[in-house]
């Protein structure tokens, strides 16, 4: 096998290298979901800048005694003689290590927002202010990493927070872009469209998950081989990932809501209320208090935890009542929809039927993922100045209360062109979907007269498109696009 490399993140890597090369005090905030590559980014930047290895400490979700015990364990591992007995000593230790030229990284920093640990922020503030006052004489720095953006913001960006306005730099890591993901898969697995869709639906752009599959030599294997190795063996690395890192954070709260949205992507507020507050057909409508509670749950899951996202039709205002809810993270959605129950049944059911069941459920979920992947490809091509469709608006779907549904609407002001797309995991369904697509597009154009005089294009998107289907679409005046067609400019 070819050795694993460092994929993507080139801009973030350059930014972090520049920070490390300043030879003066820095305090960096790095946020992003768990496993997204925050620690790997730091390690790579340290390696390229020739700095001494950083001192990494992962903060546990615990009380002060648990945190101090974990810190002392790390210190022993690094062969350092210091030990800490209080949070004040921990803050002072960080200051001393930074003055010695170390890069100190505190992972899961958001746990310091917990009441038993919050005093540490004031203690750290005192050290940070001293270091900032001597910035040109301090050769080291502090990096804080966190996976809950809202809690990191509360600790570092809230005006009343002790550490407000203390950071010198901020980085936010999102999923790997499609070009980097294609480079990774081209090197280690292959870029057959069906494989890419399967992996993206399951892992999205989380490099750690791809590396886990690579290390078990199943990244290039069949769907069921990969599922078995990653989820259904006793040593499977991702068997407890969602429960430990996503659902465990919630401690059992919001389970019903998360499962419903995962199984019904695109649910409206009314759909969720009906499903979660009405036990039967003859039940009373939900009370106002129940509606408020459900609204509060949705707000927490969207704004605090970022597990759910509310999407709007293209051109809709933020206050529009046509919003639809989706699980934001592909891995969490795949776990809730297809993997959680089969994995839980391993101890009392034959293994192979469970893997087959999970595979079939994942395949069903890939239809919605295809829409998201195609939209992401359009955006990435436009951002890079590639392809022939420069976007002037965020690409999105369109729907209304009258039943009009369009998978993707892409707008190009430069070329005065608007493109309507139908996405089908099964290419054989594309030809038959065009009549409905064109009818819905006409309703859209009547709704938005500003596009009169623009060129309207129609597009059929599938993972692969055979010559026969391509020709049939072309006879209807429809552009056929496979995933390979879409990402080809990224591979050139």
Model regions and ranges:
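N-terminal pre-P-loop "Q-motif" helix
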Residues: 5-16
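Walker A/P-loop nucleotide-binding motif
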Residues: 25-43
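Sensor-1/coupling segment of RecA-like P-loop NTPase cores
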Residues: 31, 111, 116, 120, ...
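Conserved NTP-binding/hydrolysis module of P-loop NTPases
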Residues: 51-55, 60-82, 95
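Conserved small helical "lid"/interfacial subdomain of P-loop NTPases
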Residues: 168-195
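Amphipathic alpha-helical "lid/sensor" segments that cap RecA-like P-loop NTPase cores
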Residues: 186-244, 252
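Accessory nucleic acid-recognition modules appended to NTPase machines
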Residues: 227-403
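A cross-kingdom feature that marks ATP-driven nucleic-acid transaction machinery
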Residues: 323-492
